[in-house]
Amino acid sequence: MKHIITPYEHTNDTARNNSDCPDVVLPEEIFFTISIIGVLENLIVLLAVVKNKNLQCPMYFFICSLAISDMLGSLYKILENILIMFRNRGYLQPRGNFESTADDIIDCMFILSLLGSIFSLSVIAADRYITIFHALQYHSIVTMRRTIITLTVIWIFCTGSGIAMVIFSHHVPTVLTFTSLFPLMLVFILCLYIHMFLLARSHARKISTLPRANMKGAITLTILLGVFIFCWAPFILHVLLMTFCPNNPYCVCYMSLFQINGMLIMCNAVIDPFIYAFRSPELRDAFKKMFSCHRYQ
């Protein structure tokens, strides 16, 4: 989205001249390499779930949704680099119709990546909550049918929101909507965590009898959430500063780190699959089978 994800170099030149902070420029090869790795890793996660019937359950479907979100974020950067390469070599007319349309599609993928991650983490949090505090009713509450319906609604909403944000990208309310979803997701999950903590204190004996995997899933969610905040929060702050104080020297100084903030987003897609593999023995076994070329039963 041109107004939301326009790089730092489009910031007011006068403001940049008044800042003592030089632009931090990273080679495009770094972005491209990280993005390729992110796509391949998350594709492996998707293939593992598709090919292994033991992994075809609600929890792993939610993880697949998060993997798709991460993959879209990586594809965004790959396609952007390809578009820039074609333009620099004269294959595309600068600011032509094709480039503008391609820009909009690529920007929509970026927004889908953020929105998809937000909602995927939220449903994973809800799933973990039900697993811990409604363990006996879990399979009647979280059915495959409800899981598929939930994910379908989420991605339809994300796609519609992404298209709308691209169309109205130059309006401040759009930026506020884009950035507000991030803290709203954190508030939702924080409320779940507080409720889980309060219930845990009053039902300590009951929770101690739960399977270890249930509690392990909650810890995995905490790690995923921490990585997501660490990787995306700097960029969200960049967008807010670019919108509300683009000429302030301190804001401009922070915005000089744009490419580092962008690299953190790419790293999120690379880190998540390692978390899945490290925390899930089932997924780890599926990876081993894939790489050892064993046939799935």
Swiss-Prot record:
Where, subcellularly, is it found? Cell membrane
Residues exposed to the Cytoplasmic side? 50-58, 127-147, 200-217, 279-297
Top-level taxon of the source organism: Eukaryota
Task: Indicate where a lipid (S-palmitoyl cysteine) is covalently linked.
Answer: 293
Molecular function via GO: corticotropin receptor activity
Residues in the signal sequence: none
Q: Which cysteines are joined by disulfide bonds?
A: 21-253, 245-251
Per UniProt, what is the membrane topology? Multi-pass membrane protein
Post-translational modification, as annotated: Ubiquitinated by MGRN1 that may be involved in post-endocytic trafficking and/or degradation of internalized receptor.
Listed GO cellular component terms? plasma membrane
Q: Which InterPro entries match?
A: ACTH_rcpt, GPCR_Rhodpsn, GPCR_Rhodpsn_7TM, Melcrt_ACTH_rcpt
Q: Which residues are glycosylated?
A: 12, 17
Is NAD found in the keyword set? no
User: Which keywords does this Swiss-Prot/TrEMBL entry list?
Assistant: Cell membrane, Disulfide bond, G-protein coupled receptor, Glycoprotein, Lipoprotein, Membrane, Palmitate, Receptor, Transducer, Transmembrane, Transmembrane helix, Ubl conjugation
Extracellular side stretches: 1-23, 80-104, 169-180, 245-256
Q: Does the keyword Repeat apply?
A: no
**What's a GO biological-process term for it?**
adenylate cyclase-activating G protein-coupled receptor signaling pathway
Bilayer-crossing residues are 24-49, 59-79, 105-126, 148-168, 181-199, 218-244, 257-278
Q: Name one Pfam family in it.
A: 7tm_1
Family of the protein in this entry: Belongs to the G-protein coupled receptor 1 family.
Q: What does this protein do?
A: Hormone receptor primarily expressed in adrenal cortex that plays a key role in regulating adrenocortical function. Upon corticotropin (ACTH) binding, facilitates the release of adrenal glucocorticoids, including cortisol and corticosterone. In addition, MC2R is required for fetal and neonatal adrenal gland development. Mechanistically, activates adenylate cyclase (cAMP), the MAPK cascade as well as the cAMP-dependent protein kinase A pathway leading to steroidogenic factor 1/NR5A1-mediated transcriptional activation.
Assembly and partners are described as: Homodimer. Interacts with corticotropin (ACTH). Interacts with MRAP; this interaction targets MC2R to the plasma membrane. Interacts with MRAP2; competing with MRAP for binding to MC2R and impairing the binding of corticotropin (ACTH).
Q: What is this protein called?
A: Adrenocorticotropic hormone receptor
Provide the species name.
Answer: Mesocricetus auratus
